[in-house]
From Swiss-Prot:
The gene is CCL5. Pfam families: IL8 (PF00048). It comes from the Eukaryota. It is found in: Secreted. The keyword Disulfide bond applies. Belongs to the intercrine beta (chemokine CC) family. This is C-C motif chemokine 5. SUPFAM superfamilies: Interleukin 8-like chemokines. GO terms for cellular component: extracellular space.
């Protein structure tokens, strides 16, 4: 009986200290963060879509998704990045 009580206590302690993934305020935010920008200009013909990184990220960025499904981080303050966004919005 003592063995099963000890096992129950261990399981209870483990369940208490282990938080479910949905308890995190960031669990539903699945957008990636960027830590560096592309140094050059990405060819527009390679770009399929874009999205902005979360405001929770330390570095604001636009993520361009290429036709090969690669994600490329770009500086949202660059003129070419804003032009690409405008072109994608118009199409």
């Amino acid at each position: 009986m003592k063995v099963s009580a000890a096992t129950f206590a261990i399981l209870l302690a483990t369940a208490t200290f282990r938080a479910p993934a949905s308890a995190s305020p960031y669990a539903s935010d699945t957008t990636p963060c960027c830590f560096a920008y592309i140094s050059g200009r990405l060819p527009f013909t390679h770009v399929q879509e874009y999205f902005y990184t979360s405001s929770k990220c330390s570095m604001p960025a636009v993520v361009f998704v290429t036709r090969k499904h690669r994600q490329v981080c770009a500086n949202p303050q660059k003129k070419w990045v804003r032009e690409y966004i405008n072109s994608l919005e118009m199409s």
